[in-house]
Amino acid sequence: MDLDAKFGVCRFPKKESDGTYRRYEVGKTPKSKTAIVTGELDQTLKSYILAMRTPILYDAFIRSLVIWTVDASGQLFYSFEEFSEEFDSKLTCVASLNLKYISGIKCLKLGHPTLLNFEEARATGELAIAPPEDKSVDAYINGRSGRYCRGDKTRVPTVRQLQNVADLFSSAVGLRFKARL
């Protein structure tokens, strides 16, 4: 199988302007990080998506975000986007899309590079829940990742590569996923 064609070429995440990675992310891994195992049904993600597609939860959590990445070997990982710091020993707060501050404290989110410990990725992006009224699909994926994709069109997965990832999710979760730019 040609992984370059299926998911894109491997690339490292971009570094900050000073040549380093974000210090608050180095050495951190999201607690919700999960590997999609071919042939096994991921009930956690399935339950989450089905719950979030109900009107009351969809409206309340529309901005919640799941991030995903495909590593060099073609393995798919995902996590809920989490804050860097723990609020207590049992809970890592899940971040909301574009959330920058809580009560004046800057939110430091764990991004795509933390899913692979800053190693190479083939494709990265976000998973968004489809609105309850959309009966054709349960979730969408895109190829948005600031450090793996932003600023260089050659780093962004193609629609075909994104659909290949969507197909992996569909197979593992038992729901309908669709690629969306």
Indicate where each model-derived feature is located.
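Eukaryotic phosphoinositide-binding membrane-targeting regions
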Residues: 1-181
